UniProtKB/Swiss-Prot annotation:
Residue sites binding substrate per the record: H107, R213, K218, H219, G247, H313
Active site per database record: D215 (nucleophile), E242 (proton donor)
Source species of the chain: Aeromonas hydrophila
Keywords: Carbohydrate metabolism, Glycosidase, Hydrolase, Secreted, Signal
Protein's recorded name: Alpha-amylase
Gene Ontology, cellular component aspect: extracellular region
Site location (Transition state stabilizer): D314
Gene Ontology biological process terms in this record: carbohydrate metabolic process
Catalytic activity line of the entry: Endohydrolysis of (1->4)-alpha-D-glucosidic linkages in polysaccharides containing three or more (1->4)-alpha-linked D-glucose units
Signal peptide (from-to): 1-21
Length: 464
C-alpha cells in the first residue's frame, strides 16, 4: 500500500459513530458567542464535547485573567455573560454536543495591586452590581449580589509555595509569580466556601453543563475535592483535573500528586503519564515500543479515567512547561496514536494565537485541520471496537481496532514495512480499507499475508 506523512489509519466500512464517541474540543479562550457561531463546524468535524473557558466573573483581556475569579455567583467576563452561555449550551445540545466548563475552585483573583483586603468581589464590583441591577441580576447564578461572597477568614494565610515536592506545601500556600508577587489568594475549604462552591457547580449543572475540568486540582487537598464534589454533583457528569507530572508510576510527582488524586477522588485526569510516554517514544533516541502497551507498566492511566492529549493550554503558555511542546510533525503523530487507540477521551486544543510571539498561529483553528478531522472520523467509526497490538519497533507501532480499522504510526524518516498475518489478526476479506488521510490509498485483503507500508513521518489510519 502506498501512502504519504508516518500515519496509517485504515478503516473498513465506515460504520455509524456510537453514542459514546467522545473527542473533546478545548475551545481555549474562545468567546462563548464564537463557540455558538461555529456549532455546525464543530459538529461537522466530529467533536462530541466542547470544553469552554471558566464561566464566572472575571476582568482583563489576558487569557490568564479567566483563571482569576472575582466572583462565582455570576457569569460575566470578556468571553461572555450568562445569556451567551445559555445560547452556547442550547446550540450544542441541539447538535448532540455536550458542554464542559473549566472551573476554578482553588483560589481567587490576585488584586493586591489595587486593594489590601480579601473581600470578594469587593467594594468596586459591588458598586457596579448596585448601579446596574437589571443587567447583573440576569447574569446571576446563585446568591445575594448585594453583599460580598468571601472575606479574609475564607483564605489560607499569605505565603508562596516554595517546596513544590511537598503536597502539603503545594496545597496550602499560594501560587505566586515571583518578583514580590503576593500570589493568588488560596481558599480555605471551610464550610462556607465549600457550600458556595457546591452552589456554583449545581447552578452550572442546572444550566446544562455536562462536565467539569477542575483547574489547579494539584493545589487542592483531597478533603476539599471530596467535600465539594458530592455524589449528587458528580452524578451524570464527566469530572477531571489537570495534575501535571513528568511521568507515570515510579516518578516522584506521579506518586505524590496524581496517584493520590486518582485513588481518593474517583475523578478522571489528564493523562500526563501517557503524554510522557509519547514524548519519550517520539523523541530522538526513543523507541515506539514504549507505545505498545504503556498502561501495563503504569505509564498510561486507565481508559475510563483518562483525558488524553498532545498538548494542553498550560504547556505553551507557561515558560516552565514549554519544553514539553512536540514539534509539529510529532504532534500530528501523537494525535493519530491517541485518536486511533482505545481508551481515554482525546482532547484537541485550539486557540487564537495566545502565544503568537513564540509560536505564531500554530494552534489557531487547529480543530478544523483536514488531517485531524480524518483522524476523528476514524475514532468515531471504530469507537467501541477492541484494540489489538499487531507489532512495534523502534520506528513504528501498528495495531487494529476490531475488524474495522488499522492504525500504524511511523516516526522515522523512511518507510516501514510489515507483513500482516490475517489468519492471526483477522480483517474482512475482499473489502476496501481506505486510508482516512489519503483516500487513494487502499488495502484489499485477498490472501493470508498482507503488506502494510507505513510511510515516513506520517500516520496512516485505515478504515473499512
Amino acid at each position: 500500500m502506498k501512502n504519504t506523512a508516518g500515519i496509517l489509519a485504515i478503516a473498513g466500512m465506515l460504520i455509524a459513530p456510537l453514542a459514546h464517541a467522545d473527542v473533546i474540543l478545548h475551545a481555549f479562550n474562545w468567546k462563548y458567542s464564537e463557540v455558538t457561531a461555529k456549532a455546525d463546524l464543530i459538529k461537522g468535524a466530529g467533536y462530541k464535547q466542547v470544553l469552554i473557558s471558566p464561566p464566572l466573573k472575571s476582568s482583563g483581556n489576558e487569557w490568564w485573567a479567566r483563571y482569576q475569579p472575582q466572583d462565582l455567583r455570576l457569569v460575566d467576563s470578556p468571553l461572555g455573560n450568562k445569556q451567551d452561555l445559555e445560547q452556547l449550551i442550547a446550540a450544542m445540545q441541539a447538535r448532540g454536543i455536550a458542554v464542559y466548563a473549566d472551573v476554578v475552585l482553588n483560589h481567587m483573583a490576585n488584586e493586591s495591586w489595587k486593594r489590601n483586603d480579601l473581600n470578594y468581589p469587593g467594594t468596586e464590583l459591588l458598586g457596579q452590581y448596585a448601579a446596574n441591577p437589571d443587567y447583573y441580576s440576569r447574569q446571576r447564578l446563585f446568591g445575594d449580589l448585594g453583599q460580598n461572597l468571601l472575606s479574609a477568614s475564607d483564605f489560607h494565610p499569605e505565603g508562596c509555595i516554595t517546596d513544590w515536592s511537598d503536597p502539603g506545601h503545594v496545597q496550602y500556600w499560594r501560587l505566586c509569580g515571583g518578583a514580590g508577587d503576593k500570589g493568588l489568594p488560596d481558599l480555605d475549604p471551610n464550610n462556607w466556601v465549600v457550600s458556595q462552591q457546591q452552589a456554583y457547580l449545581k447552578a452550572l449543572k442546572g444550566m446544562g453543563i455536562k462536565g467539569f475540568r477542575v483547574d489547579a486540582v494539584k493545589h487542592m487537598s483531597d478533603y476539599q475535592i471530596n467535600a465539594v464534589f458530592t455524589p449528587e454533583i458528580k452524578q451524570g457528569m464527566h469530572v477531571f483535573g489537570e495534575v501535571i507530572t513528568t511521568g507515570g508510576a515510579g516518578s516522584t510527582d506521579y506518586e505524590r500528586f496524581l496517584k493520590p488524586y486518582l485513588d481518593n477522588s474517583g475523578q478522571g485526569a489528564y493523562d500526563f503519564p501517557l503524554f510522557a510516554s509519547l514524548r519519550g517514544a517520539l523523541g530522538y533516541g526513543g523507541s515506539m515500543n514504549q507505545l505498545a502497551d504503556p498502561g501495563a507498566y503504569g505509564q498510561a492511566l486507565p481508559g475510563n479515567r483518562a483525558v488524553t492529549f498532545a498538548i494542553t493550554h498550560d504547556i505553551p503558555t507557561n515558560d516552565g512547561f514549554r519544553y514539553q511542546i512536540l514539534n509539529q510533525t510529532d504532534e500530528k503523530l501523537a494525535y493519530a496514536y491517541l485518536l486511533g487507540r482505545d481508551g481515554g477521551s482525546p482532547l484537541v486544543y485550539s486557540d487564537h494565537g495566545e502565544t503568537q510571539d513564540k509560536d505564531g498561529l500554530r494552534w489557531q483553528d487547529y480543530y478544523l485541520r483536514s488531517d485531524l478531522k480524518g483522524m476523528i472520523r476514524f475514532h468515531n467509526a471504530v469507537q467501541g471496537q477492541p484494540m489489538q497490538l499487531i507489532g512495534s519497533g523502534d520506528c513504528f507501532v501498528l495495531f487494529k481496532r476490531g475488524k474495522q480499522g488499522l492504525v500504524g504510526v511511523n516516526k522515522c524518516d523512511y518507510e516501514q514495512e510489515y507483513w500482516l498475518d490475517t489468519a492471526k489478526f483477522e480483517l474482512n476479506w475482499y473489502r476496501n480499507y481506505k486510508d482516512v488521510l489519503d483516500q487513494s490509498a487502499v488495502i484489499n485483503v485477498q490472501s493470508q499475508w498482507v503488506r502494510v507500508a507505513m510511510p515516513a513521518r506520517r500516520p496512516p489510519l485505515a478504515a473499512e
